[in-house]
């Protein structure tokens, strides 16, 4: 499902996606037609974003 569990987090998640794309060398990711990117490029952004979100949750759960 594409429905967000916390709709209020949408802006923060979009900002995180743009920051990660920049880190991965995909400048102007916001204005690029994602259909023109390879599945690998789009997958890197989503995969790295998921990794960062899991790390954040683990830190929060451990109290660090």
Swiss-Prot record:
Q: Which UniProt keywords apply?
A: DNA-binding, Sporulation
Q: Name one GO molecular function term.
A: double-stranded DNA binding
Site for Cleavage, residues: 19-20
Record-linked Gene3D superfamilies: Small, acid-soluble spore protein, alpha/beta type-like
* Protein's name in the database: Small, acid-soluble spore protein beta
Pfam families of this UniProt entry? SASP
Task: Please name the InterPro entries in this protein's record.
Answer: SASP_alpha/beta-type (IPR001448), SASP_alpha/beta-type_CS (IPR018126), SASP_DNA-binding (IPR050847), SASP_sf_alpha/beta (IPR038300)
Q: What else is known?
A: SASP are degraded in the first minutes of spore germination and provide amino acids for both new protein synthesis and metabolism.
Query: What are the top taxonomic ranks of the organism?
Result: Bacteria, Bacillati, Bacillota, Clostridia, Peptostreptococcales
Family in the record: Belongs to the alpha/beta-type SASP family.
Main role? SASP are bound to spore DNA. They are double-stranded DNA-binding proteins that cause DNA to change to an a-like conformation. They protect the DNA backbone from chemical and enzymatic cleavage and are thus involved in dormant spore's high resistance to UV light.
**Does the entry feature the keyword DNA-binding, yes or no?**
yes
Example GO BP: sporulation resulting in formation of a cellular spore
